[in-house]
Amino acid sequence: MLSKNLLEALNDQMNHEYFAAHAYMAMAAYCDKESYEGFANFFIQQAKEERFHGQKIYNYINDRGAHAEFRAVSAPKIDFSSILETFKDSLSQEQEVTRRFYNLSEIARQDKDYATISFLNWFLDEQVEEESMFETHINYLTRIGDDSNALYLYEKELGARTFDEE
């Protein structure tokens, strides 16, 4: 059985994952508006991944005999000055998610809820990948700078991204 404190934190994180999906869709909308269809697809796939994460937490809460609680999702940032800004904001968002999962893990440890600790380890591993990916994209975009040909090629590369549930 999940403690009240842990259940509250899991519900918060589930809702935060859905907020992250909204934020990535807002980034996709910016990219589409600026005619960067490849980058838009990248962020759409990222949004799918966040929804999958939310669903994974939802399933876990229910599997533990508790109740998943959905809350209002606040509006994400919609104005960006550049593609680079969307990726920098993405990295900040992922760093916040990592911090949140560390906090969740600490609550589970305090509760000696070893099943939840095991469950959360998957997310912690995922966050290492997410932060590394965005740091790499930021580095590439910074190097590309104003080189429109390089940006075009990089957009095409990222536009090929798909998301497969694991």
Curated annotation (Swiss-Prot):
Fe cation 1 binds at residues 17, 50, 53. GO terms for molecular function: ferric iron binding; ferrous iron binding; ferroxidase activity. It catalyses: 4 Fe(2+) + O2 + 6 H2O = 4 iron(III) oxide-hydroxide + 12 H(+). Gene3D superfamilies: 1.20.1260.10. Induction: Induced by iron. Repressed by PerR. Negatively regulated by Fur. In addition, is regulated in a PerR-independent way under metal-depleted conditions. Fe cation 2 binds at residues 50, 94, 127. InterPro entries: Ferritin, Ferritin-like, Ferritin-like_diiron, Ferritin-like_SF, Ferritin_DPS_dom, Ferritin_prok. Iron-storage protein. GO terms for cellular component: cytoplasm; cytosol. It is an enzyme of class 1 (oxidoreductase). It comes from the Bacteria. Keywords: Cytoplasm, Iron, Iron storage, Metal-binding, Oxidoreductase. It is found in: Cytoplasm. GO terms for biological process: intracellular iron ion homeostasis; iron ion transport. The keyword Protease does not apply. Its main location: cytoplasm. It comes from Staphylococcus aureus (strain NCTC 8325 / PS 47). Coiled coil: none annotated. This is Bacterial non-heme ferritin. The gene is ftnA. Belongs to the ferritin family. Prokaryotic subfamily. Its EC number is 1.16.3.2. Residues 2-145 form the Ferritin-like diiron domain.
